[in-house]
From Swiss-Prot:
Keywords: Cell membrane, Membrane, Ubl conjugation
Organism of provenance: Homo sapiens
Keyword Endoplasmic reticulum attributed: no
Chief location: membrane
GO terms under cellular component: cytoplasm; cytoplasmic vesicle; extracellular exosome; extracellular vesicle; plasma membrane
Protein name: Arrestin domain-containing protein 1
Domain notes: The PPxY motifs mediate interaction with WW domain-containing ubiquitin-protein ligases.
Compositionally biased tracts (Pro residues): 301-312
Subunit comment: Interacts (via PPxY motifs) with ITCH (via WW domains); the interaction is direct and participates in the recruitment of the ubiquitin-protein ligase ITCH to the NOTCH1 receptor. Interacts with ARRB1 and ARRB2; the interaction is direct. Interacts with TSG101; may recruit TSG101 to the plasma membrane. Interacts (via PPxY motifs) with WWP2 (via WW domains); ubiquitinates ARRDC1. Interacts with SLC11A2; controls the incorporation of SLC11A2 into extracellular vesicles through an ubiquitination-dependent mechanism. Interacts with WWP1 (via WW domains). Interacts with NEDD4 (via WW domains).
Length: 433
């Protein structure tokens, strides 16, 4: 065995997650098989962010630092054989951003220790990553408890000479949710044509924006629900819910290089119609009772009123009457065909030394009474704490895989903003989106 048999960093009480402004205490342990002369023993606490133009590349194009503090644990001398412990303590800045790790960049907080030896001898180094969570209180966001509503109208041609339109309206009960909360979705589809529509699909999207030489947008589907299509000259309503899985919070206050947004996108493929609702994911739930919108009747401010179509052609009306079908104004309710959701990667916890147990899947209380449960974010993000004792409950449906980055240079176009969705403006890839 070598002269240095053990050189490691441990944090007090085995903690791995801290809040901004908290003290961080720990110990540097050294075990020597023989005396070791040294020039200095130092420990450093560092927080930084790096962004790259290529996926999974740590050659950062842009970097920014949040804190860098050093302590001298011992001056020049010699350590005798045996075990030695050096306690340390740092105060984390109140502005430190939440830890995050993605394919194009990450926010990393770590403690590094080094034994600087005399000239021509090898220095000894070790490090330990810890995580910072700056909780997002959804109640601090204006109008967060209000319903989220958007509408889109698509005009199209069919059978060469006939024209029609589809009015798609979608709404949610709130504008912000926490992990494990059910997002209540209401959709209203008015098929003002003689052609059946394709199935209606609702997707919860995550958009992570990285500021390198230009903005890079990484968009992936977190959960997806598919309903039935709407028959010709019919109006249909669809009520569904999406359980919010373990996800990193919206935005990353204190970091100017990485930003996280979430969207609920409701769409039809034929005819092509899409509405996009921005939603917030936080750590502290909305404490106001939500205002339930009237399904299919809510419209964003300034939007034109829904137009009731004229009666269908005479031959179609007669066929409808003979079949005993419902009137256009009598909405039918769509059934759900499939529901798929990405599952949390619980296996990644094993790579975090001393990490607490993950959230119980059955909603039972956490084993540790002093701390909220530790959850795992989907994708390549880091563990974080969520409010409450219940964890996300993954479905048994097909897993939705993230985009394959090896086959293309950059992620595809970001989803449109709320204003673009409501105003019919084509989305563009801009830093403000």
């Amino acid at each position: 065995m070598g002269r240095v048999q053990l050189f490691e960093i441990s944090l007090s009480h085995g903690r791995v997650v801290y809040s901004p402004g908290e003290p961080l205490a720990g110990t540097v342990r050294v075990r020597l098989g023989a005396p070791l002369p040294f020039r200095a023993i130092r420990v450093t606490c560092i927080g930084s962010c790096g962004v790259s133009n290529k996926a999974n590349d740590t050659a950062w194009v842009v970097e920014e630092g949040y804190f860098n503090s050093s302590l001298s644990l011992a001056d020049k001398g010699s350590l005798p054989a045996g075990e030695h412990s050096f306690p340390f303590q740092f105060l984390l800045p109140a502005t430190a951003p939440t830890s995050f790790e993605g394919p194009f960049g990450k926010i990393v907080h770590q403690v590094r220790a080094a034994i600087h030896t005399p000239r021509f001898s090898k220095d000894h180094k070790c490090s330990l990553v810890f995580y910072i969570l700056s909780p997002l209180n959804l109640n601090s966001i204006p109008d967060i408890e209000q319903p989220n509503v958007a509408s889109a109208t698509k005009k199209f041609s069919y059978k060469l000479v006939k024209t029609g339109s589809v009015v798609l309206t979608a709404s949610t009960d709130l504008r912000g949710y926490v992990v494990g909360q059910a997002l209540q979705l209401h959709a209203d589809v008015e098929n003002q044509s003689g052609k059946d529509t394709s199935p209606v699909v609702a997707s919860l999207l995550q958009k992570v924006s990285y500021k390198a030489k230009r903005w890079i947008h990484d968009v992936r589907t977190i959960a997806e629900v598919e309903g039935a299509g709407v028959k010709a000259w019919r109006r249909a309503q669809w009520h569904e819910q999406i359980l919010v899985p373990a996800l990193p919070q919206s935005a990353l206050p204190g970091c100017s290089l990485i930003h996280i947004d979430y969207y609920l996108q409701v769409s039809l493929k034929a005819p092509e119609a899409t509405v996009t609702l921005p939603v917030f994911i936080g750590n502290i739930a909305v404490n106001h009772a939500p205002v339930s919108p009237r399904p299919g009747l809510g419209l964003p401010p300034g939007a034109p009123p829904l137009v009731v179509p004229s009666a269908p052609p005479q031959e179609e009306a007669e066929a409808e009457a003979a079949a005993g079908g419902p009137h256009f104004l009598d909405p039918v309710f769509l059934s759900t065909k499939s529901h798929s959701q990405r599952q949390p990667l619980l296996a990644t916890l094993s790579s975090v030394p001393g990490a607490p147990e993950p959230c119980p899947q059955d909603g039972s209380p956490a084993s540790h009474p002093l701390h909220p449960p530790l959850c795992i974010s989907t994708g390549a993000t880091v563990p974080y704490f969520a409010e409450g004792s219940g964890g996300p409950v993954p479905t048994t449906s097909t897993l939705i895989l993230p985009p394959e980055y090896s086959s293309w240079g950059y992620p595809y176009e970001a989803p449109p903003s709320y204003e673009q969705s409501c105003g019919g403006v084509e989305p563009s890839l801009t830093p403000e989106s």
